Every structure is written in C-alpha cells, then in structure tokens.
Curated annotation (Swiss-Prot):
GO-annotated biological processes: chaperone cofactor-dependent protein refolding
UniProt xrefs under NCBIfam families: PRK00364.1-2, PRK00364.1-6, PRK00364.2-2, PRK00364.2-3, PRK00364.2-4, PRK00364.2-5
Gene: groES
Organism: Geobacillus thermodenitrificans (strain NG80-2)
Protein name: Co-chaperonin GroES
Keyword terms, alphabetized: Chaperone, Cytoplasm
SMART domains with a match to the protein in the record: Cpn10
Molecular-function GO terms, alphabetical: ATP binding; metal ion binding; protein folding chaperone; protein-folding chaperone binding; unfolded protein binding
Protein task: Together with the chaperonin GroEL, plays an essential role in assisting protein folding. The GroEL-GroES system forms a nano-cage that allows encapsulation of the non-native substrate proteins and provides a physical environment optimized to promote and accelerate protein folding. GroES binds to the apical surface of the GroEL ring, thereby capping the opening of the GroEL channel.
Length: 94
C-alpha cells in the first residue's frame, strides 16, 4: 500500500457520470476534471517552522472535494490514485 509522507494524502478519485439537462451522457473528452475523491492513506502531517508537527485534518475513508488541477496521478497495483497536499483539499463531504 502507498504510504504518503508529511502532509500528503493519497486519494481514489470518484468518477461521476455527467449528463446534460436534456439527458445526454457526456463523453470523457467533454467532461470536467473530477474534484471528488475518497481518502485511502494519510501522511504524518506537516511540520511547522518551530519543529512542531500538525496532524492532518482528514482521515482514511473521508470523502473530499479538492482543487481541480491539484496533485500527482499515480498508478499502483493496477489502480489509479492521486497524491496531493492537505492544503489542496477544499472540503470534507458529510
């Protein structure tokens, strides 16, 4: 399993099927980049200038909204993940 370092978070992107108001399903090339995911691994947190470590605010299993162009896409063990910094997370759903 991937173990992120520092303030990095590993997420599995949640793909949603997009339809227009009239019911037409959009092809992948016309879709917006997804911004929703599920946290699968969390780093140990960021370190402040004084050396104090701040624990991440998200936990494994959280559903999140993240910045549109954030993170690095990686493929591991046949699955695609996104590794991003905690600061790229905009909100936790629910």
């Amino acid at each position: 399993m991937l173990k992120p370092l520092g303030d990095r978070i590993v997420i599995e992107v949640v793909e949603t099927e997009e339809k227009t108001a009239s019911g037409i399903v959009l092809p992948d090339t016309a879709k917006e980049k997804p911004q929703e995911g599920r946290v699968v691994a969390v780093g140990t947190g960021r370190v402040l200038d004084n050396g104090q470590r701040v624990a991440p605010e998200v936990e494994v299993g959280d559903r999140i909204i993240f910045s549109k162009y954030a993170g690095t896409e990686v493929k591991y063990d046949g699955k695609e993940y996104l590794i991003l910094r905690e600061s790229d997370i905009l909100a936790v759903i629910g």
